[in-house]
Amino acid sequence: MKVVAVGGGTGLSTLLKGLKNIDSFEITAVVSVTDEGGSSGKLRKELNVPPPGDVRNNIVALAKDEDLLAKLMSYRFSEGSFKGHSLGNLIIAALTKIEGSFSEAIRILERVLAIKGRVLPVSEDHARLVARFEDGEEVIGETNIVRKGGKIVEVRLDRPIDALPEVLEAIERADIIIFGPGSLYTSIITNVLVNGVKDAIKKSKAKKIYVCNLMTQPGETTGYRVSDHVKELERYLEQSVDFVLVNTRKPSEEVLERYRKEGSDFVEIDAENIQNTILAEPFLVEIVDPSDGQRKIRHDSVKLADVIERISRW
């Protein structure tokens, strides 16, 4: 069973941690390349390499010895000239320079870490995300888009870039294509904007699944319900998804209040506005982030994988 997961960031890596435990799944993760924040943004600007952070997260998620590797690859320097950089990002950047290819650097790391599946950047070319807001202003760059806030009317890339042939082949041959979880515009739709991706998805006979976010994202999806997420994704795909996975469990009031202070809120399910097949489950789990001790919410990777495995048998 060939499974392609499209996205970037924490959401996609959470999904992959569950999918890798299903023996029948051959996994390909397709990762966005428009990230401009943090360590990835600095390396992209200073070394002229594609942003390695999302790729690193997803390689670690698919690794067999995840606990040990996560500590090594995710180690972030807190002082000196490397402050803010993770070791994994530096390794990927160095391999890219040595091999002259971002994709080859990833392949080497995949072999070294013995991951289940593969991780592909959607493209090796450079592009920035551009958003046009309801007030008419256009903002360039993911970080600036989120900082601007307001209702996004349209997103595009600042220049045309081509998808890797391996990405298009994986999509066209897939039995299942999963979108998300992850930032709607900056992690998911940004992949669809790359030349060839949308057409490959249209050609594919795969079952198409959207995993909706648990919370809205300030500056990106403020006030969005489940149907708003689905409609926006389908607008850029120019086709419907077959299944929508939504969470039914609300966070504790303490956690919810902290998210609200950051401009984020629980994504409400408005099933009456959704034509797709909805699978509603208590996907939410609360975790303690070891980096800051804060209680945060994530998708339950095991439950997600179980539901997707069930869909694969329908």
Swiss-Prot record:
Keyword Cytoplasm attached: yes
The answer to whether keyword Cytoplasm applies is yes
The superkingdom of the source organism is: Bacteria
Q: Name one GO molecular function term.
A: LPPG:FO 2-phospho-L-lactate transferase activity
- SUPFAM superfamilies xref list: CofD-like
- What are its GO biological-process terms? regulation of cell shape
What GO CC annotations are associated with the protein? cytoplasm
S-S bridge residues = none
This chain belongs to which protein, by name? Putative gluconeogenesis factor
User: Which organism is this entry from?
Assistant: Thermotoga maritima (strain ATCC 43589 / DSM 3109 / JCM 10099 / NBRC 100826 / MSB8)
